[in-house]
Amino acid sequence: MIAQILIADDNPDITGLLSDYLGMKSHRVIVVNDGFQLSQKASEHQPHLIITDIQMPGAYGSSAYQVLQKDPKTKNIPLIFMSAHPYEKLAKLLPNDPKTRFVQKPVDLAKLEALIKELLPLGGYVP
């Protein structure tokens, strides 16, 4: 089974880098550029994992998270939040949920890969 991962970020350099990297790891990648598309595509495709920027047009990643939690199709999808700001500055915006993690930009791909491996089983992915 190929893992399906949704990436949400308004920076095309970030989405391109992550999409290429995850594609090389044999994941199927869906890319969106704002919080509205994030909620819409997550409900439509029901990915195994979402990687989202916290601050982007349409809705902050943390606001999109709240929308995802209200939808039975998406409420159990694990998320990795990304930001250029350190975790300490954003902790109060982020949910206290065992299915969420945080990674700071610029993204350390080895750390991201470890988080993906940790979270994919929570999203129903079976290798």
What are these regions (language model features)?
Residues 60-63, 85-104, 110-118:
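Alpha4 helix (beta4-alpha4-beta5 surface) of REC/receiver domains from two-component response regulators
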Residues 53:
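Active-site residues of response regulator receiver
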Residues 33-37, 60-66:
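Acidic catalytic/metal-coordinating carboxylates
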Residues 26-33, 41:
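Short hydrophobic/Thr-rich beta-strand motif most characteristic of the beta2 strand and flanking loop
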Residues 16-24:
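Charged docking surfaces used in two-component/phosphorelay signaling
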Residues 11-15:
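Short acidic/polar segment at the start of the alpha1 helix of CheY-like receiver
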Residues 56:
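Receiver (REC) domain active-site loop signature in two-component systems and cognate sites
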